[in-house]
Amino acid sequence: MKQALRVAFGFLILWASVLHAEVRIVIDSGVDSGRPIGVVPFQWAGPGAAPEDIGGIVAADLRNSGKFNPLDRARLPQQPGSAQEVQPSAWSALGIDAVVVGQVTPNPDGSYNVAYQLVDTGGAPGTVLAQNSYKVNKQWLRYAGHTASDEVFEKLTGIKGAFRTRIAYVVQTNGGQFPYELRVSDYDGYNQFVVHRSPQPLMSPAWSPDGSKLAYVTFESGRSALVIQTLANGAVRQVASFPRHNGAPAFSPDGSKLAFALSKTGSLNLYVMDLASGQIRQVTDGRSNNTEPTWFPDSQNLAFTSDQAGRPQVYKVNINGGAPQRITWEGSQNQDADVSSDGKFMVMVSSNGGQQHIAKQDLATGGVQVLSSTFLDETPSLAPNGTMVIYSSSQGMGSVLNLVSTDGRFKARLPATDGQVKFPAWSPYL
Protein backbone atom coordinates (compact mmCIF):
# COMPACT_ATOMS: atom_id res chain seq x y z
CA MET A 1 0.00 0.00 0.00
CA LYS A 2 2.80 2.43 0.88
CA GLN A 3 4.56 1.83 -2.44
CA ALA A 4 1.31 2.30 -4.34
CA LEU A 5 0.66 5.55 -2.51
CA ARG A 6 4.12 6.84 -3.46
CA VAL A 7 3.41 6.09 -7.13
CA ALA A 8 0.06 7.83 -6.99
CA PHE A 9 1.40 10.82 -5.05
CA GLY A 10 2.71 12.34 -8.25
CA PHE A 11 -0.87 13.12 -9.24
CA LEU A 12 -1.48 15.31 -6.21
CA ILE A 13 0.37 18.25 -7.71
CA LEU A 14 -2.35 18.43 -10.36
CA TRP A 15 -5.29 18.31 -7.98
CA ALA A 16 -5.48 22.09 -7.98
CA SER A 17 -7.13 21.60 -11.37
CA VAL A 18 -9.70 19.06 -10.14
CA LEU A 19 -13.00 19.59 -11.93
CA HIS A 20 -16.52 19.39 -10.60
CA ALA A 21 -18.05 18.30 -13.94
CA GLU A 22 -16.97 14.68 -13.62
CA VAL A 23 -17.94 11.53 -15.47
CA ARG A 24 -19.67 8.73 -13.59
CA ILE A 25 -20.34 5.11 -14.45
CA VAL A 26 -23.95 4.36 -15.42
CA ILE A 27 -24.55 0.62 -15.75
CA ASP A 28 -26.66 -0.45 -18.73
CA SER A 29 -26.69 -4.25 -18.50
CA GLY A 30 -24.97 -7.37 -17.26
CA VAL A 31 -24.72 -6.89 -13.50
CA ASP A 32 -27.49 -9.42 -12.81
CA SER A 33 -25.34 -12.19 -14.25
CA GLY A 34 -22.54 -11.48 -11.78
CA ARG A 35 -21.75 -13.54 -8.69
CA PRO A 36 -23.87 -12.47 -5.68
CA ILE A 37 -21.83 -10.96 -2.85
CA GLY A 38 -22.55 -9.04 0.33
CA VAL A 39 -20.78 -5.75 1.03
CA VAL A 40 -21.75 -4.25 4.38
CA PRO A 41 -21.36 -0.51 5.12
CA PHE A 42 -18.05 -0.12 6.92
CA GLN A 43 -18.41 0.57 10.63
CA TRP A 44 -17.44 4.16 11.50
CA ALA A 45 -15.75 4.58 14.87
CA GLY A 46 -15.66 8.38 14.99
CA PRO A 47 -18.06 11.23 15.76
CA GLY A 48 -20.67 12.38 13.26
CA ALA A 49 -20.83 10.98 9.75
CA ALA A 50 -18.03 8.99 8.14
CA PRO A 51 -15.85 11.09 5.80
CA GLU A 52 -16.19 8.52 3.00
CA ASP A 53 -18.47 5.57 2.29
CA ILE A 54 -15.79 2.91 1.91
CA GLY A 55 -18.29 0.07 1.78
CA GLY A 56 -20.10 1.86 -1.03
CA ILE A 57 -16.84 2.23 -2.96
CA VAL A 58 -16.07 -1.49 -2.62
CA ALA A 59 -19.60 -2.46 -3.68
CA ALA A 60 -19.45 -0.14 -6.71
CA ASP A 61 -16.04 -1.46 -7.75
CA LEU A 62 -17.16 -5.07 -7.60
CA ARG A 63 -20.37 -4.21 -9.48
CA ASN A 64 -18.44 -2.24 -12.12
CA SER A 65 -16.22 -5.25 -12.80
CA GLY A 66 -19.21 -7.06 -14.25
CA LYS A 67 -18.25 -10.18 -12.32
CA PHE A 68 -20.17 -9.47 -9.09
CA ASN A 69 -23.68 -8.43 -8.15
CA PRO A 70 -23.53 -6.88 -4.66
CA LEU A 71 -26.76 -7.21 -2.69
CA ASP A 72 -28.66 -3.94 -2.34
CA ARG A 73 -28.20 -2.42 1.09
CA ALA A 74 -31.94 -2.51 1.76
CA ARG A 75 -31.82 -6.30 1.37
CA LEU A 76 -28.84 -6.97 3.65
CA PRO A 77 -29.98 -9.53 6.24
CA GLN A 78 -27.70 -7.95 8.86
CA GLN A 79 -25.05 -5.24 9.10
CA PRO A 80 -22.17 -6.79 11.03
CA GLY A 81 -19.24 -4.62 12.01
CA SER A 82 -16.70 -7.45 12.14
CA ALA A 83 -16.10 -10.95 10.83
CA GLN A 84 -17.15 -12.45 14.16
CA GLU A 85 -20.59 -10.84 13.85
CA VAL A 86 -21.36 -12.36 10.46
CA GLN A 87 -24.12 -15.00 10.69
CA PRO A 88 -23.36 -17.43 7.83
CA SER A 89 -26.86 -18.89 7.62
CA ALA A 90 -28.45 -15.47 7.11
CA TRP A 91 -26.32 -14.89 4.01
CA SER A 92 -26.25 -18.40 2.57
CA ALA A 93 -30.05 -18.37 2.60
CA LEU A 94 -29.79 -15.60 -0.01
CA GLY A 95 -27.27 -17.50 -2.11
CA ILE A 96 -24.32 -15.41 -0.91
CA ASP A 97 -21.12 -17.24 -0.01
CA ALA A 98 -18.85 -14.24 0.64
CA VAL A 99 -19.36 -11.04 2.64
CA VAL A 100 -17.13 -7.97 2.96
CA VAL A 101 -17.18 -6.15 6.30
CA GLY A 102 -14.93 -3.34 7.45
CA GLN A 103 -14.09 -0.59 9.87
CA VAL A 104 -12.93 3.04 9.55
CA THR A 105 -11.27 4.56 12.61
CA PRO A 106 -10.01 8.15 12.98
CA ASN A 107 -6.54 8.70 14.48
CA PRO A 108 -5.43 11.63 16.68
CA ASP A 109 -3.04 12.84 13.94
CA GLY A 110 -5.92 13.31 11.48
CA SER A 111 -5.31 10.11 9.54
CA TYR A 112 -7.62 7.11 9.35
CA ASN A 113 -7.27 3.36 9.72
CA VAL A 114 -9.28 1.45 7.13
CA ALA A 115 -9.67 -2.30 7.65
CA TYR A 116 -11.68 -4.97 5.88
CA GLN A 117 -12.37 -8.68 6.20
CA LEU A 118 -13.66 -10.98 3.46
CA VAL A 119 -15.77 -13.60 5.23
CA ASP A 120 -16.62 -17.07 3.91
CA THR A 121 -20.26 -17.78 4.78
CA GLY A 122 -19.89 -21.43 3.76
CA GLY A 123 -17.39 -22.18 6.50
CA ALA A 124 -17.37 -21.93 10.27
CA PRO A 125 -18.61 -18.61 11.70
CA GLY A 126 -15.92 -15.95 11.42
CA THR A 127 -13.95 -17.74 8.67
CA VAL A 128 -11.85 -15.03 6.99
CA LEU A 129 -10.65 -15.51 3.40
CA ALA A 130 -8.68 -12.26 3.23
CA GLN A 131 -8.13 -9.18 5.36
CA ASN A 132 -5.97 -6.07 5.49
CA SER A 133 -5.74 -2.62 7.01
CA TYR A 134 -4.31 0.71 5.81
CA LYS A 135 -3.43 3.99 7.46
CA VAL A 136 -4.24 6.88 5.11
CA ASN A 137 -4.93 10.59 5.10
CA LYS A 138 -8.40 11.85 4.20
CA GLN A 139 -7.61 12.45 0.52
CA TRP A 140 -6.57 8.80 0.17
CA LEU A 141 -9.73 7.23 1.62
CA ARG A 142 -11.18 6.44 -1.82
CA TYR A 143 -7.82 4.94 -2.79
CA ALA A 144 -7.95 2.73 0.32
CA GLY A 145 -11.41 1.58 -0.74
CA HIS A 146 -10.16 0.73 -4.23
CA THR A 147 -7.24 -1.16 -2.66
CA ALA A 148 -9.62 -3.28 -0.61
CA SER A 149 -11.65 -3.92 -3.78
CA ASP A 150 -8.53 -5.03 -5.65
CA GLU A 151 -7.65 -7.53 -2.94
CA VAL A 152 -11.19 -8.91 -2.62
CA PHE A 153 -11.50 -9.19 -6.40
CA GLU A 154 -8.21 -11.06 -6.74
CA LYS A 155 -8.99 -13.42 -3.87
CA LEU A 156 -12.34 -14.41 -5.35
CA THR A 157 -11.44 -14.50 -9.06
CA GLY A 158 -7.70 -15.13 -9.22
CA ILE A 159 -7.42 -12.03 -11.44
CA LYS A 160 -5.49 -8.96 -10.33
CA GLY A 161 -7.86 -6.09 -9.60
CA ALA A 162 -7.65 -2.85 -11.58
CA PHE A 163 -9.67 -0.48 -9.42
CA ARG A 164 -6.69 1.74 -8.58
CA THR A 165 -6.14 2.56 -12.24
CA ARG A 166 -6.94 5.77 -14.09
CA ILE A 167 -8.21 6.75 -17.51
CA ALA A 168 -7.02 9.57 -19.74
CA TYR A 169 -9.27 11.13 -22.37
CA VAL A 170 -9.81 14.26 -24.44
CA VAL A 171 -12.80 16.52 -23.83
CA GLN A 172 -13.95 19.09 -26.35
CA THR A 173 -15.83 21.65 -24.30
CA ASN A 174 -18.42 24.10 -25.53
CA GLY A 175 -16.38 27.14 -26.50
CA GLY A 176 -13.91 29.20 -24.49
CA GLN A 177 -10.29 30.09 -25.15
CA PHE A 178 -9.10 26.50 -24.62
CA PRO A 179 -11.90 24.20 -25.82
CA TYR A 180 -9.71 21.07 -25.90
CA GLU A 181 -8.65 19.44 -22.63
CA LEU A 182 -6.64 16.34 -21.88
CA ARG A 183 -8.00 15.00 -18.60
CA VAL A 184 -7.26 12.14 -16.23
CA SER A 185 -9.60 10.60 -13.69
CA ASP A 186 -9.87 7.51 -11.54
CA TYR A 187 -11.22 4.58 -13.54
CA ASP A 188 -14.71 5.31 -12.15
CA GLY A 189 -14.65 9.01 -13.12
CA TYR A 190 -13.83 10.45 -9.69
CA ASN A 191 -10.93 12.84 -9.00
CA GLN A 192 -10.88 14.22 -12.54
CA PHE A 193 -8.18 16.79 -13.33
CA VAL A 194 -6.87 18.61 -16.38
CA VAL A 195 -3.43 17.65 -17.69
CA HIS A 196 -3.35 20.12 -20.58
CA ARG A 197 -5.62 22.76 -22.13
CA SER A 198 -5.31 23.80 -25.77
CA PRO A 199 -6.97 26.08 -28.33
CA GLN A 200 -6.27 23.39 -30.95
CA PRO A 201 -7.26 19.70 -31.07
CA LEU A 202 -5.61 17.12 -28.80
CA MET A 203 -5.60 13.45 -29.75
CA SER A 204 -4.53 9.91 -28.90
CA PRO A 205 -3.23 9.96 -25.30
CA ALA A 206 -1.08 6.94 -24.38
CA TRP A 207 0.26 5.97 -20.94
CA SER A 208 3.85 5.11 -20.13
CA PRO A 209 4.06 1.64 -18.52
CA ASP A 210 4.87 3.13 -15.11
CA GLY A 211 1.90 5.50 -15.29
CA SER A 212 4.03 8.62 -14.82
CA LYS A 213 3.74 10.10 -18.33
CA LEU A 214 1.29 10.61 -21.17
CA ALA A 215 2.19 10.84 -24.84
CA TYR A 216 -0.34 12.62 -27.05
CA VAL A 217 -0.83 14.58 -30.27
CA THR A 218 -1.18 18.36 -30.25
CA PHE A 219 -1.73 20.90 -33.05
CA GLU A 220 -0.72 24.00 -31.08
CA SER A 221 2.33 24.74 -33.25
CA GLY A 222 0.21 24.96 -36.38
CA ARG A 223 0.82 21.35 -37.37
CA SER A 224 0.64 18.01 -35.62
CA ALA A 225 3.29 17.18 -33.05
CA LEU A 226 3.91 14.26 -30.69
CA VAL A 227 4.77 15.17 -27.11
CA ILE A 228 5.35 13.34 -23.83
CA GLN A 229 4.17 15.06 -20.65
CA THR A 230 5.30 14.11 -17.14
CA LEU A 231 2.24 14.19 -14.89
CA ALA A 232 4.04 15.01 -11.64
CA ASN A 233 5.54 18.31 -12.82
CA GLY A 234 3.93 19.07 -16.19
CA ALA A 235 7.24 18.92 -18.10
CA VAL A 236 6.73 18.41 -21.84
CA ARG A 237 9.16 16.71 -24.25
CA GLN A 238 8.53 17.06 -27.99
CA VAL A 239 9.11 13.73 -29.73
CA ALA A 240 8.19 14.41 -33.36
CA SER A 241 6.97 17.35 -35.42
CA PHE A 242 7.73 16.37 -39.00
CA PRO A 243 5.88 17.69 -42.06
CA ARG A 244 2.40 16.23 -42.57
CA HIS A 245 1.13 13.71 -40.03
CA ASN A 246 2.59 12.83 -36.60
CA GLY A 247 0.30 10.58 -34.59
CA ALA A 248 -0.77 7.39 -32.80
CA PRO A 249 1.88 7.16 -30.03
CA ALA A 250 2.30 3.91 -28.08
CA PHE A 251 4.84 3.18 -25.32
CA SER A 252 6.48 -0.24 -25.36
CA PRO A 253 5.68 -2.40 -22.31
CA ASP A 254 9.31 -2.20 -21.15
CA GLY A 255 9.19 1.60 -21.30
CA SER A 256 12.23 1.96 -23.53
CA LYS A 257 10.54 2.79 -26.83
CA LEU A 258 7.73 4.81 -28.36
CA ALA A 259 6.03 3.70 -31.57
CA PHE A 260 4.12 6.19 -33.71
CA ALA A 261 3.00 6.95 -37.27
CA LEU A 262 4.57 9.58 -39.55
CA SER A 263 3.83 10.60 -43.13
CA LYS A 264 6.97 12.66 -43.70
CA THR A 265 7.81 10.61 -46.82
CA GLY A 266 4.26 10.60 -48.21
CA SER A 267 2.36 7.53 -47.02
CA LEU A 268 1.78 6.84 -43.34
CA ASN A 269 4.37 4.49 -41.88
CA LEU A 270 5.37 3.21 -38.47
CA TYR A 271 8.45 4.43 -36.65
CA VAL A 272 9.99 3.56 -33.28
CA MET A 273 11.99 5.94 -31.09
CA ASP A 274 14.51 4.80 -28.51
CA LEU A 275 13.49 7.09 -25.66
CA ALA A 276 16.93 7.18 -24.05
CA SER A 277 18.83 8.26 -27.17
CA GLY A 278 16.03 9.86 -29.17
CA GLN A 279 17.04 7.78 -32.20
CA ILE A 280 14.17 7.05 -34.62
CA ARG A 281 14.02 4.12 -37.02
CA GLN A 282 11.41 3.26 -39.64
CA VAL A 283 9.55 -0.04 -39.22
CA THR A 284 7.20 -0.20 -42.23
CA ASP A 285 7.69 1.02 -45.77
CA GLY A 286 5.60 1.27 -48.91
CA ARG A 287 2.78 3.25 -50.44
CA SER A 288 0.03 1.89 -48.18
CA ASN A 289 -1.01 3.65 -44.98
CA ASN A 290 0.27 2.01 -41.79
CA THR A 291 -0.84 3.47 -38.47
CA GLU A 292 -2.32 2.83 -34.99
CA PRO A 293 0.49 0.70 -33.51
CA THR A 294 -0.02 -1.33 -30.35
CA TRP A 295 2.68 -3.43 -28.70
CA PHE A 296 2.81 -7.11 -27.95
CA PRO A 297 4.14 -7.97 -24.44
CA ASP A 298 7.66 -8.72 -25.74
CA SER A 299 8.25 -5.06 -26.73
CA GLN A 300 9.55 -6.36 -30.07
CA ASN A 301 6.37 -6.84 -32.10
CA LEU A 302 3.60 -4.46 -33.08
CA ALA A 303 0.02 -4.91 -34.21
CA PHE A 304 -1.08 -2.06 -36.46
CA THR A 305 -3.67 -0.95 -39.00
CA SER A 306 -2.80 -1.07 -42.70
CA ASP A 307 -4.76 -0.63 -45.92
CA GLN A 308 -2.22 -2.57 -47.99
CA ALA A 309 -4.93 -5.07 -48.99
CA GLY A 310 -7.40 -2.30 -49.86
CA ARG A 311 -9.52 -1.87 -46.74
CA PRO A 312 -8.02 -1.37 -43.27
CA GLN A 313 -7.02 -4.60 -41.52
CA VAL A 314 -4.77 -5.43 -38.55
CA TYR A 315 -1.26 -6.74 -39.19
CA LYS A 316 1.67 -7.83 -37.04
CA VAL A 317 5.30 -6.85 -37.62
CA ASN A 318 8.61 -7.28 -35.80
CA ILE A 319 10.32 -3.93 -35.27
CA ASN A 320 13.70 -5.48 -36.16
CA GLY A 321 12.64 -6.49 -39.66
CA GLY A 322 10.53 -8.93 -41.61
CA ALA A 323 7.35 -8.74 -43.65
CA PRO A 324 4.09 -7.78 -41.90
CA GLN A 325 1.58 -10.60 -41.37
CA ARG A 326 -2.15 -10.02 -41.60
CA ILE A 327 -3.97 -11.23 -38.48
CA THR A 328 -7.62 -10.15 -39.06
CA TRP A 329 -9.80 -11.91 -41.61
CA GLU A 330 -13.39 -11.54 -40.36
CA GLY A 331 -15.38 -8.41 -41.19
CA SER A 332 -15.05 -5.92 -44.03
CA GLN A 333 -12.47 -3.93 -42.10
CA ASN A 334 -10.70 -3.99 -38.73
CA GLN A 335 -8.57 -1.30 -37.15
CA ASP A 336 -7.28 0.42 -34.01
CA ALA A 337 -6.32 -2.74 -32.11
CA ASP A 338 -5.17 -2.97 -28.48
CA VAL A 339 -3.30 -6.15 -27.52
CA SER A 340 -3.85 -7.61 -24.05
CA SER A 341 -0.98 -7.56 -21.58
CA ASP A 342 -0.64 -11.36 -21.80
CA GLY A 343 -0.66 -11.31 -25.60
CA LYS A 344 -3.53 -13.80 -25.81
CA PHE A 345 -6.14 -11.55 -27.43
CA MET A 346 -6.75 -8.09 -28.78
CA VAL A 347 -9.71 -5.75 -29.02
CA MET A 348 -10.34 -3.63 -32.10
CA VAL A 349 -12.87 -1.65 -34.09
CA SER A 350 -14.56 -4.09 -36.46
CA SER A 351 -16.87 -3.07 -39.30
CA ASN A 352 -19.31 -5.37 -41.03
CA GLY A 353 -22.70 -4.87 -42.65
CA GLY A 354 -22.60 -1.14 -42.07
CA GLN A 355 -22.05 -1.56 -38.31
CA GLN A 356 -18.92 -0.42 -36.45
CA HIS A 357 -18.44 -2.11 -33.09
CA ILE A 358 -15.76 -3.18 -30.63
CA ALA A 359 -14.71 -6.80 -31.12
CA LYS A 360 -12.34 -9.21 -29.40
CA GLN A 361 -10.08 -11.59 -31.32
CA ASP A 362 -8.35 -14.62 -29.85
CA LEU A 363 -4.80 -14.42 -31.20
CA ALA A 364 -4.27 -18.19 -31.05
CA THR A 365 -7.47 -19.34 -32.77
CA GLY A 366 -8.47 -16.21 -34.68
CA GLY A 367 -11.98 -16.40 -33.22
CA VAL A 368 -13.81 -13.07 -33.10
CA GLN A 369 -16.54 -11.93 -30.70
CA VAL A 370 -18.40 -8.63 -31.09
CA LEU A 371 -18.58 -6.98 -27.66
CA SER A 372 -20.40 -3.67 -28.06
CA SER A 373 -23.82 -2.64 -29.35
CA THR A 374 -23.42 1.13 -29.38
CA PHE A 375 -23.09 3.42 -32.43
CA LEU A 376 -19.91 4.23 -34.38
CA ASP A 377 -17.57 2.79 -31.75
CA GLU A 378 -13.95 3.96 -31.73
CA THR A 379 -10.57 3.82 -29.93
CA PRO A 380 -10.85 0.79 -27.61
CA SER A 381 -8.43 0.57 -24.67
CA LEU A 382 -8.05 -2.45 -22.40
CA ALA A 383 -7.85 -2.42 -18.62
CA PRO A 384 -4.46 -3.80 -17.51
CA ASN A 385 -6.05 -7.01 -16.24
CA GLY A 386 -7.83 -7.57 -19.55
CA THR A 387 -11.35 -7.81 -18.11
CA MET A 388 -12.81 -4.52 -19.40
CA VAL A 389 -12.60 -2.23 -22.43
CA ILE A 390 -13.19 1.51 -22.48
CA TYR A 391 -14.04 3.13 -25.80
CA SER A 392 -15.85 6.11 -27.31
CA SER A 393 -19.06 6.05 -29.33
CA SER A 394 -21.41 8.51 -30.97
CA GLN A 395 -24.49 9.61 -29.08
CA GLY A 396 -26.73 12.26 -30.59
CA MET A 397 -24.49 15.01 -31.94
CA GLY A 398 -21.58 14.17 -29.65
CA SER A 399 -19.41 11.36 -28.32
CA VAL A 400 -19.34 9.58 -24.96
CA LEU A 401 -17.24 6.95 -23.19
CA ASN A 402 -18.46 3.40 -22.72
CA LEU A 403 -17.34 0.29 -20.86
CA VAL A 404 -17.83 -3.30 -21.92
CA SER A 405 -16.45 -6.47 -20.34
CA THR A 406 -14.26 -8.66 -22.52
CA ASP A 407 -16.84 -11.44 -22.24
CA GLY A 408 -19.44 -9.02 -23.63
CA ARG A 409 -21.91 -9.39 -20.75
CA PHE A 410 -21.43 -6.16 -18.81
CA LYS A 411 -22.05 -2.76 -20.42
CA ALA A 412 -21.91 0.72 -18.92
CA ARG A 413 -21.56 4.39 -19.88
CA LEU A 414 -19.47 7.23 -18.47
CA PRO A 415 -21.50 10.27 -19.54
CA ALA A 416 -19.81 13.67 -19.28
CA THR A 417 -21.73 16.86 -18.56
CA ASP A 418 -19.53 19.49 -20.15
CA GLY A 419 -18.49 18.35 -23.62
CA GLN A 420 -17.71 15.58 -26.07
CA VAL A 421 -15.35 12.87 -24.80
CA LYS A 422 -12.94 10.98 -27.07
CA PHE A 423 -9.71 8.98 -27.19
CA PRO A 424 -9.91 7.10 -23.86
CA ALA A 425 -6.76 5.36 -22.64
CA TRP A 426 -6.71 3.03 -19.63
CA SER A 427 -3.66 3.36 -17.42
CA PRO A 428 -1.38 0.53 -16.32
CA TYR A 429 -1.50 -0.66 -12.71
CA LEU A 430 -0.64 2.25 -10.42
Swiss-Prot record:
<dbReference type="GO" id="GO:0042597">
    <property type="term" value="C:periplasmic space"/>
</dbReference>
<dbReference type="Pfam" id="PF07676">
    <property type="entry name" value="PD40"/>
</dbReference>
<comment type="function">
    <text>Part of the Tol-Pal system, which plays a role in outer membrane invagination during cell division and is important for maintaining outer membrane integrity. TolB occupies a key intermediary position in the Tol-Pal system because it communicates directly with both membrane-embedded components, Pal in the outer membrane and TolA in the inner membrane.</text>
</comment>
<dbReference type="Pfam" id="PF04052">
    <property type="entry name" value="TolB_N"/>
</dbReference>
<dbReference type="GO" id="GO:0017038">
    <property type="term" value="P:protein import"/>
</dbReference>
<keyword id="KW-0732">Signal</keyword>
<comment type="subunit">
    <text>The Tol-Pal system is composed of five core proteins: the inner membrane proteins TolA, TolQ and TolR, the periplasmic protein TolB and the outer membrane protein Pal. They form a network linking the inner and outer membranes and the peptidoglycan layer.</text>
</comment>
<keyword id="KW-0574">Periplasm</keyword>
<dbReference type="InterPro" id="IPR011042">
    <property type="entry name" value="6-blade_b-propeller_TolB-like"/>
</dbReference>
<keyword id="KW-0131">Cell cycle</keyword>
<comment type="similarity">
    <text>Belongs to the TolB family.</text>
</comment>
<dbReference type="GO" id="GO:0051301">
    <property type="term" value="P:cell division"/>
</dbReference>
<feature type="signal peptide">
    <location>
        <begin position="1"/>
        <end position="21"/>
    </location>
</feature>
<dbReference type="InterPro" id="IPR007195">
    <property type="entry name" value="TolB_N"/>
</dbReference>
<dbReference type="InterPro" id="IPR014167">
    <property type="entry name" value="Tol-Pal_TolB"/>
</dbReference>
<keyword id="KW-0132">Cell division</keyword>
<dbReference type="InterPro" id="IPR011659">
    <property type="entry name" value="PD40"/>
</dbReference>
<protein>
    <recommendedName>
        <fullName>Tol-Pal system protein TolB</fullName>
    </recommendedName>
</protein>
